[in-house]
């Protein structure tokens, strides 16, 4: 997608690429955000499994955090935004995630879950009142907008079952399921 986003950004830079109830992003903006996020994630030591987790309601930022992870060579772990801090902590520990992305509605639970799981990097949007959370926009500004490398191999995403017969279980899904 970064190549696709870059091509669209060149052809139609000001055309809408992504819209949610609070904003609309152009192809040029999406291209820059994905590349900045991917380059930052690519440069971060995420351990052997290279996992990030996204604990947020549906939004442009939620999708872009997942895409940044995918193109940054990480396995993305969606965490259901309805979960309690304890339930989210279980998934964060079990998945061995290193970065947690949150929004204003999950930040408090995400901070608690990240502490319990040993995650020290929590990045969020609309979370200005939480000093433990790195601001998404500020974080992105520290990353390079250059096209992320093509040779980065996407890793399988890790989705968790509902846990109807016990604790949720992680199931790896191929990255091409979402973008391929």
Regions found by a protein language model. Name each.
Residues 3-26, 43, 131:
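AMP-dependent adenylate-forming
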Residues 14, 143-162, 166-167:
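Conserved pre-ATP/AMP-binding loop-to-beta segment of ANL
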Residues 23, 38-86:
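Conserved AMP-binding/adenylate-forming
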Residues 26-28, 156-180:
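Conserved AMP-binding A3 loop
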Residues 56, 79-80, 120-129:
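Short beta-strand elements of ligand-binding domains
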Residues 74, 117-121:
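A short helix->loop->beta-strand "cap" motif at the edges of active sites that frequently abuts
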Residues 83-113:
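Conserved ATP-dependent adenylate/AMP-binding module captured primarily in the ANL superfamily
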